[in-house]
Amino acid sequence: MQVQLETLGNLERRLDIALPLTDIDAEVQKRLARVARTAKIAGFRPGKAPLKMVERNYGASVREDVLGEQVQLGFSKAVAEQKLRVAGYPRFEPAADNDPAAGEFKFSATFEVYPELTLGSLDGKEVEKAVCEVTDAEIDKTIDVLRKQRTRFNRVERAAADTDRVIIDFAGKIDGEAFAGGSSENFPFVLGQGQMLPEFEAGVIGMKEGESKDVEVSFPADYHGKDVAGKTAVFTITVKNVAEAILPEIDADFAKALGITDGDVSKLRAEIEKNVKREIARRLAARNKEAVMQVLIDANPLELPQSLVMMEISRLMHQAKQDLAQRGMDVKSLPDLPADLFRDQAARRVALGLILAELVKANELKASPEQIKARVEEWADSYEHPEEVIKWYYESPERLEGPENLVLEDNVVEFVLSQAKVNEKAVSFDELMGNA
């Protein structure tokens, strides 16, 4: 086998390979002999047809299979000899001047290689580490949210006020003409939640059941309804019902409704505190991991094999379609999503994959069995029967790959934080939970 390597670019390579036809022909004859033992050819009993007849019927397909295998085998040997790290899949092309009389089959393989990566120093690199203290106030806020989720409304005979639920009829006109979406009957909404435009809500506040009035409302220029954006409408509003919000008391009934079977309010608070702290820890870990990953990318600029980026784009596109399908959309009728929509995300994921692999290898980072077990137990704790979840994970080594990879990422984060300059930043509970 003859091999010639050519560098086409920073990461692109081409191997020109010549395979001896004697090896290919020998393998073809060996395969045909095997096929002949069971070949069914008209006029002959199975396995009794002459080899020439078998070759006439099956020779082309057998030769094609053998040639494909020999090309792949020859490429693998050449790559090993040249000590190349192939990224993605090669593109094979037969040589234009192939001549059987020359006794060889020539082809080329064009491909990309992994970039040489020398990890950048983390000394002096700054990482912003978010921290969040969970106090009684945060627990109280969470309990308040749970109470509001169980709000009931009692009808009242007074003017509508903030937090009241009102049921109204309304009909809007612009320049005296009705417009699409501008009217409704028996429409319920809660004042103060921002469901309606501020001028509309302000007009309803102070109205009583049975009262009607006209309210002028200006639609913002960037309003989602383009037909009315930037225009002024007059709404005739009739209030049909006013009801005030009644929050449940924090008592045994409330605790039971949230799964505390004996109604012990102190147990409820302890359970909520545990869940809040777990969620805070999860969000902090995700936020800090993202900060660490950005530091690694900034410290290790590298050219990416585009074959790997395209593979990741395909994976992300497939994942996006699956997500849409799970939401009930008919993805078959949708046009293909543009690749550029995923390019930046794909490039980031490929870069991080290369950097993390090198970092783990260079620093011999591992996920210990104890860490993996702790992660599985943490996940299982949120289920009704944790022991069954733990058993399920440990029934198959493949199932442990997920928690193992996440633990390894956590170890990378801890390693980077131990090497870089860490600046702690206090983050409020509301900001972390997305309520700010």
Curated annotation (Swiss-Prot):
TM ranges: none
Q: Which reaction does it catalyse?
A: [protein]-peptidylproline (omega=180) = [protein]-peptidylproline (omega=0)
Q: Which NCBIfam families match?
A: tig (TIGR00115)
- Pfam families attached here? FKBP_C (PF00254), Trigger_C (PF05698), Trigger_N (PF05697)
Described purpose of this protein according to its UniProt entry: Involved in protein export. Acts as a chaperone by maintaining the newly synthesized protein in an open conformation. Functions as a peptidyl-prolyl cis-trans isomerase.
Task: Provide the organism lineage as a comma list.
Answer: Bacteria, Pseudomonadati, Pseudomonadota, Betaproteobacteria, Neisseriales
A GO term from the CC aspect: cytoplasm
Indicate the family of this protein. Belongs to the FKBP-type PPIase family. Tig subfamily.
> Listed GO molecular functions?
peptidyl-prolyl cis-trans isomerase activity; protein folding chaperone; ribosome binding
Protein's cellular compartments: Cytoplasm
Domain note: Consists of 3 domains; the N-terminus binds the ribosome, the middle domain has PPIase activity, while the C-terminus has intrinsic chaperone activity on its own.
State where it is primarily located. Answer: cytoplasm
Q: Sorted alphabetically, which PANTHER family does this protein's record hold?
A: TRIGGER FACTOR CHAPERONE AND PEPTIDYL-PROLYL CIS/TRANS ISOMERASE, TRIGGER FACTOR-LIKE PROTEIN TIG, CHLOROPLASTIC
- Which superkingdom, per the lineage? Bacteria
Q: Which GO terms describe its biological process?
A: 'de novo' cotranslational protein folding; cell division; chaperone-mediated protein folding; protein transport; protein unfolding
Recorded source organism is: Laribacter hongkongensis (strain HLHK9)
Give the EC number: 5.2.1.8
- PROSITE patterns in alphabetical order: FKBP_PPIASE
The name on file for this protein is Trigger factor
Family annotation (InterPro entries): PPIase_dom_sf, PPIase_FKBP_dom, Trig_fac, Trigger_fac_C, Trigger_fac_C_sf, Trigger_fac_ribosome-bd_bac, Trigger_fac_ribosome-bd_sf, Trigger_fact/SurA_dom_sf
Enumerate the UniProt keywords alphabetically: Cell cycle, Cell division, Chaperone, Cytoplasm, Isomerase, Rotamase
